[in-house]
Curated annotation (Swiss-Prot):
Residues 100-118, 130-150, 286-297, 309-332 have a biased composition (Low complexity). Residues 31-53, 100-150, 280-361 are annotated as: Disordered. Pfam families: NIF (PF03031). Its EC number is 3.1.3.-. Belongs to the CTDSPL2 family. This is CTD small phosphatase-like protein 2. Residues 298-308 have a biased composition (Polar residues).
Length: 567
């Protein structure tokens, strides 16, 4: 016991650092064996050598298996590192107390037996080097296959080194007491990386206190199970993270598909609205052409009983097929309310038209014309001749002088065909009572001009029949009107005459809404044989022949501005 082999071994191990990080360090096992005395106690030395060989055979495969398993657990490495450090410190602290007693139990052996021990230690170092290389390559492979791009770390635990202590009473126990042993022997350390972070282990002698060793091993085994459970939890976290990422990716794809479906649905709705609008327009046009009665007319008529919106719909088709000399001017009234929405359900159109007629207020329409902007229409008439009368009298045609219908009338005055839009219509016409007398009188004192919102193809043929003697000087048709919100307005500036000497008679007051002071309203006529409106206007018209400006007289007579202001 006094003269024996004094052995010192240093083991430098890298503990709990990532292979990827540049600041992590990898340490290798380095042993140095110095023999100062020969061991004379051969049986105990043989037992120690035998235990070293068994330990080397167990450590290498155990470490390799554990490194392979731990290569896959790369999340929460700080938590696992803290557990391993705590276990290592507690275990080595407990074993340090045993090293003193183990020294006294081991007797020196002969120098001849030191060589097998050194060979066993070199075998352990070589195995740990290979284990470090395999750990590095395994960690790199795991990093490349990591779905969530979380860096993996190599974790080295000493549990496998200490697990054999249950069966072996004497084994090699790491010690971290300092850089020198109790006898003052030198310990050489060697590191591969630049920065120093060392774990020193002193290969001292073993203790024979089986009870303390059993307690320590039991504690380390329980801690090892906790480490394994922690690594399993890390694996579960990795799987959950991968599933969350996959679910998020699927949710993004689903959201994109839903957005595309919504856009497609909106486009289909727009297309359906356009088709429905066109269908409604066609239905309204066909209804206006087929459901004609004493108060209705085809699209070449301008009938007061037609709703302005319906008139706008029917004239859209007819204006494209008839060639005219002047362009129709259209303006838009600036109103806050809009009636352009499409109704999903259509009731009886005749009832709707009657309701719209009751609701339509021509004086309110004229009041709103103050917000309208329009370009002056081009002059449609030649200059007035010097031989012509001073005052120009503008007359409306339908429901002012005559009433026409495509439905048979009782005792019509005229019947004539009209070929319109590839369709031939039979028109039945009746002249207003006292029409001939009225026309004869006014043609002698006024320049008579017909200004109608009807189509030329119809109105021109009718005028040729009711005015065979050409008492009417000029004829203007729909193409000379101004279209405003479903109504055809007659801007008197198209005449090229001085408005001080222009008078217009129309059954639709909104028709002369731009020049209210020049307009004389008259009641619409259909079939009343007792009507005398035309005859009663002659005296007032005759009173205007000698005035310089007809507008103040018309204003005082009919007081239309009061009706407009009250609308």
């Amino acid at each position: 016991m006094s003269s024996g082999l004094k052995t010192q071994t240093t083991i430098d191990i890298l503990h709990d650092h990532s292979v990827e990080s540049s600041s992590d360090h990898l340490y290798i096992l380095k042993q140095q064996q110095q023999h100062q005395h020969e061991d004379t106690d051969s049986p105990k030395k043989k037992k120690l050598r035998h235990q070293c060989e068994e330990t080397s055979q167990y450590i290498v495969p155990s470490l390799n298996d554990e490194v392979d398993d731990l290569g896959h657990h790369h999340l929460h490495h700080h938590h696992v590192n803290n557990i391993n450090n705590s276990l290592l410190k507690q275990g080595l602290s407990a074993l340090s107390s045993l090293s003193a007693s183990s020294t006294s139990s081991i007797s020196p052996s002969s120098s001849q037996s030191s060589s097998p021990l050194k060979q066993s230690e070199r075998s352990i170092a070589t195995s740990i080097d290979s284990m470090n290389d395999s750990t590095s390559s395994s960690s790199s492979s795991n990093n490349n296959n990591n779905f969530s791009s979380v860096p993996s770390h190599n974790i080295y635990t000493p549990s496998c080194l200490l697990s054999n202590l249950n069966n072996d009473t004497d084994s090699i126990i790491p010690n971290m007491n300092g850089s020198t042993d109790g006898d003052g022997g030198d310990i050489r350390r060697e590191k591969v990386d630049e920065n120093d972070e060392e774990v020193l282990c002193n290969d001292n002698h073993l203790s024979k206190d089986n009870e303390q060793e059993d307690n320590m091993v039991s504690f380390l085994n329980e801690s090892n199970e906790e480490v394994i459970q922690t690594n399993n939890n890390n694996n579960n976290d990795n799987n959950n993270s991968s599933n969350i990422c996959i679910n998020n990716f699927c949710n993004i794809n689903n959201n994109q598909q839903q957005q595309q479906q919504q856009q497609q649905q909106q486009q289909n709705n727009v297309n359906s609205s356009i088709i429905l609008e066109d269908s409604n327009k066609e239905n309204k046009t066909e209804s206006n052409n087929s459901n004609s009665n004493s108060n209705s007319s085809p699209s070449f008529f301008h009938n007061l009983q037609q709703h302005p919106t319906s008139a706008a719909t029917t004239t859209t088709t007819t204006t494209t097929t008839i060639t005219t000399t002047s362009a129709t001017t259209s303006i838009i009234i600036k109103e806050d309310n809009s009636d352009d929405e499409i109704d999903d359900e259509c009731d009886d159109e005749s009832e709707e038209e009657e309701e719209d007629e009751e609701e339509f207020n021509p004086f309110l329409f004229i009041k709103q014309l103050a917000n309208a902007t329009t370009m002056p229409p081009p002059v449609a008439l030649p200059p007035k001749e010097h031989s012509s009368p001073k005052i120009s009298l503008v007359l409306d045609l339908d429901e002012t002088l005559v009433h026409c219908s495509t439905e048979p009338l009782e005792q019509p005055h005229l019947t004539f065909p009209v070929f319109f839009n590839n369709t031939e219509y039979q028109v039945f016409a009746k002249k207003r009572p006292f029409f001939e007398e009225f026309l004869h009188k006014v043609s002698d004192i006024f320049e008579v001009i017909i200004f109608t919102a009807s189509q030329e193809v119809y109105a021109n043929k009718l005028l040729n029949m009711i005015d065979p003697n050409n008492k009417i000087k000029y004829r203007l048709y729909r193409d000379s009107c101004v279209y405003v919100d479903g109504n055809y307005l007659k801007d008197l500036s198209v005449l090229g005459r001085d408005l001080k000497q222009v008078v217009i008679i129309d059954n639709s007051p909104q028709s002369f809404g731009f020049q209210v002071d020049n307009g004389i309203p008259i009641e619409s006529w259909f079939e009343d044989e007792n009507d005398k409106e035309l005859l009663q206007l002659v005296p007032f018209l005759e009173s205007l022949t000698n005035v310089e400006d007809v507008r103040p007289h018309i204003r005082d007579k009919f007081k239309l501005y009061q009706l407009i202001s009250q609308a």
